[in-house]
Amino acid sequence: MEHTYYTTQLQAGLGLIEETQLLLSEWQFGMSTQELFQTALASGTFSNITARRLRNIIAECFAPRYLNPKPQPATWLRQLNYSINASSLKQLFFIYTARANLIFRDFITELYWERYAAGYTELSNEDSREFVLRATSGGKTKNLWSDTTIKRLSSYLLSIC
């Protein structure tokens, strides 16, 4: 059985609500990530970001969340895009982000919900940092992460919630 490690992929894109909605509008069933990139780039919809950033959003965020291993999430979300309220759509994006990012999923299930169930109303930066430190020292990352990476990922985890 292959061991799945935590990665830093989450830092490639937080939120991305508007970008995801726009990409869902551009995406067609059967498109590869490269085809989606070319279509999105040609559309001019993403003129406020570089082509490299658009490619990263598609490859590191959109595809893992909504296209892999199969494009069923993108198919469903495309049908719901702009037709359900923003809060509900954000919750669906949240779920697919957690499914694609193991560290985020575990943060939610092992820390966020435990604290919420215990009556806490907020998490601190230190709570998030300790979670990431335990993960790196506990063998959940392929390599030990630098202090900068730990700080950045801790902040990202907290900001999504």
Where are these regions (language model features)?
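Eukaryotic partner-binding/assembly regions in large regulatory complexes
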Residues: M1-E114
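Short, positively charged loop/turn segments that connect secondary-structure elements
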Residues: A51, G119, L133-L153
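Short, hydrophobic-biased segments on the C-terminal half of alpha helices
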Residues: A59, A63, S154-S159
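Short, amphipathic alpha-helical segments
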Residues: A98, L102, E122-E126, L144-S155
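A contiguous catalytic/ligand-binding core that recognizes phosphate-bearing ligands
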Residues: F107-L123, R129, K142-L144
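Amphipathic alpha-helical interaction surfaces
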Residues: E114, R134-G138, I160
